[in-house]
Amino acid sequence: SPSRGLGDVYKRQEWHRQRGDELVLISASGEHLVAPMAQMLGMDHCVAILLDEEAGMLTGQTRGTLSFREGKVVRINQLFAGKEHLWQGSFGYSDSHNDLPMLQAVSHPHAVNPAPALRQCAEELGWPLWIWQLHP
């Protein structure tokens, strides 16, 4: 089962599903790693770093905007071009201060199991701080 070992993550995903939200897994890792995880989790969309391939081999070159820091906001805007209204009421979850631009762009930012730098920012901005259990 995709939910096995994900505990609170799965519960929150189900909450979003019941609301009819579109679920996006966005990562600064390569799409070849993130896409299978997004599929396993039943995400509607996957946004990750695009890597060039030649003859089925990764070249080490990237293409497009990297989904890192401000690039995550750019890539989400590209994904939902013409549907900018989807930002209204949107939720974002992260553990890293590198995701501050994305968290500042959503309506409901959440710092989840945050690293110290994000914890400090979230406390200063009054964002919810959540500690999720990764095991049921």
Question: Where do the protein language model's features map onto the residues?
Answer:
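Short, acidic/turn-prone active-site loops that include or flank metal/cofactor-
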Residues: 48-54, 114-118, 134-136
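Short, well-ordered alpha-helix to beta-strand connector turns
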Residues: 6, 20, 43, 106-107
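Conserved Lys-Pro-Asp/Glu-containing loop-to-beta segment of HAD-superfamily phosphomonoesterases
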Residues: 71-98
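Acidic, Mg2+-coordinating phosphoryl-transfer loop and its flanking beta/alpha structural elements
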Residues: 23-28, 91-131
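A polyampholytic, Gly/Pro-enriched intrinsically disordered region
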Residues: 63-77, 132-136
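Single conserved hydrophobic/aromatic residue that forms the stacking wall/gate
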Residues: 1-10
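Cytosolic catalytic headpieces and adjacent flexible linkers of membrane translocases
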Residues: 34-64, 93, 103
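Substrate-recognition element of Asp-dependent hydrolases with the DxDx(T/V) motif
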Residues: 12-41, 45-50
